[in-house]
Amino acid sequence: MSNRTNDLPKLSGIKHLIREMRYHEFSRQSIGIILVSVFCLETSSNSIIPYASNFAISLILLGLATRMYASGFVLKNKELSTTGPYAFVRHPLYTGNIMILIGLCLINGFFWSFVTAFIFLWFYYPTAIEYEDRKLKSLFPDTWEEWASMTPALMPKMDLNGKIFSRLDLRSWSLKKSLIANYEPVIVVYVLVWVFIVLQR
């Protein structure tokens, strides 16, 4: 049994196997990395949306920037990040991933890429979010509840009070956390290399 499911009700048979697969972090990350290359290797010139490539690249860059931004605030299992991107959503790294994946689907241009991405997100992300929330609540019981009640999981609320820039907290961003603790620049370079390959065709 995965340590991610130790606190969950016990299951057996096929239900147990499927749940273990859905909670398996390495599988989720590996498949996500593979999908980047697959979507970029197989591309259609007849894109579903006109000028999709420009919009898609913008979406990918925004997703990468979101990941870089978020990774510079988080220190896994040692502190509860509630500032910067974590003032808007509880899981900004996943938000960035979704933007990147949608952008790659648009670049790919085939219907099957959207179906594949949807199945991937549906299969892995609800359990990943559930586990992260459960873990953080256990590690930081005094602060997690209030923060989670005010902060959505993936989609930020509309900021109507005009304080969005002060909430960004860019001065607290740390390259050391992003580079050393989370290896985020490696992911950025990997995705950008594949996008560059597509653009050279």
Briefly describe each language-model feature range.
Residues 1-83, 98-201:
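Membrane-anchoring alpha-helices and their flanking helix-loop junctions
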Residues 86-87, 91-95:
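Glycine-rich acyl-CoA binding loop
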